[in-house]
């Protein structure tokens, strides 16, 4: 029986969903043993007292205010806000939702970004979101360098893994506001949400906040040159994110923490930190680009090919795209290299890994788009689609027979 294109994609979806379920099942099974530790207690104490006193929603906001007001150490205000919402403050048994929240946020935020990027103008590409997004998520979760800090410890994971996810949602809203024609009311709602996320992301860990700032500024410059209407719609989002970062950097509490932990001195000058972040990020990429990553990219290329064929983007200057995305990615390491000379470990190493997979996929997708838009390749479109169709048939059949029953 000959399979139609729709049936092939259904089989691929089923196979990948089963694979994701198999990967996540043991990670979620041990969640019942998860328990608060370290900073969970200190940041969650006001919320715990409010819940014990039965203060309700008003108590939640008052506890967040107290956490901010009593702080004498942490300049990154978003860390204080998110840390105050520690699940065990509402009941110890709630702490087990931490890995569900963190892993779920990574997966769902990437689905949203993929939907915006590949299916925003080509609705038929919605069938490609899961076949591209699930393998990415499996690789990110399965090979996360520090899963205990990134998925199971609330205070660490919410300010790194979860904020990584918030940055992707922010980017999704940003692109939706900039590139899509929507009603005025919807655009206002999306802009307000994007502004709130910009403040939260900008006021959190410097790896995510600085790289997001660099990315938004690059997009803002591009819009100023090519799409002034998009620039007018989005400049406020970029401004708020940048101001949040600068507020954290220039806060007296940052100097207090620097004095307390490092004697008031830094390991490198700003220029040296930028140079070292480029150098070490390049070495990091080389060390991470192994057989499993290359295999993932090879498996995804047919789906990339099908996606970009239906997209209206021109995919110009792929070399410049790669250079800029490398610079944005490298900016994640600049803050820690500046302060203590390291790339950062633990939960920060995890978000470096998440972004590595994301940017690798984005670059291969972009280069595929550039190739398909070239005239020399465009005349062979029917042959390319036929090859892609044959690959999808074999791929779906293989996954169907190798997936767990």
Report residues per predicted region.
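Signature aromatic-anchored transmembrane alpha helix within multi-pass, membrane-resident enzymes
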Residues: 242, 321-322, 370-400
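Transmembrane-helix motifs of polytopic, lipid-linked glycan transferases
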Residues: 97, 101-126, 169
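Membrane-interface micro-motifs in multi-pass membrane enzymes
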Residues: 39, 129-175, 205, 330-365
